[in-house]
Amino acid sequence: MPETTPRGYPTIRRKQYHHPMQTFDALLGEAEVAHGHLCAGQILGVRMAMLGCERLGIEDPKGADRKRLVTYVEIDRCATDAIAVVTGCRLGKRALKFRDWGKMAATFVDLSTGKAIRIAALESSKQRARELYPNIENKNQQQMLAYRELPTTELFSEEWVTVPIHPREMPGYKSARIACARCGEGINYDREVLVGEETLCQACASPETRYYQPLTEK
């Protein structure tokens, strides 16, 4: 007899998806497609993200564990696309956070345990690539070969850290949508600014700090 609810309806069991972590080569192939080309940064990003998941015990970041992981990246370069591919973290899901520090580094946060690990590429890895492949003049080709085979201890530094995440920064956070008193545009996720008695968007509150400047003022 099938299981039923208290009202007699058949119980609907949701399918449990489990996709164990793919191999390095498979993930690198996906990263290459997503990024548009293969480079040393892609290899670093894939290995960095795989290591972060391994340290946190996350086996299925794009399936069963998809709500456990938040990733902070510190550079807007090739490695970030690879990290997004491996972890499944996306900016639009609020699971990928960007800090513009210009560093080849990322911090992986397990929301279920609060554990977090920051992994950074070692500058010495470039010298190790030159030592391993001195006959290859192209630096990218040299690093692509070396970064595939160097042990993680020669590629990365690892540091257990704590990452306080404000509730409004969490994936799935919902807030009221407020209209700016000046431009009328909607503001989400508590990003409004109170200036005197006006509730403004950040662009209207501090026009001099806008990343854009209008050609004609309204």
Q: What is each of the regions a protein language model found here?
A:
Residues 68-108:
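A structural-propensity feature for long, helix-poor, extended segments
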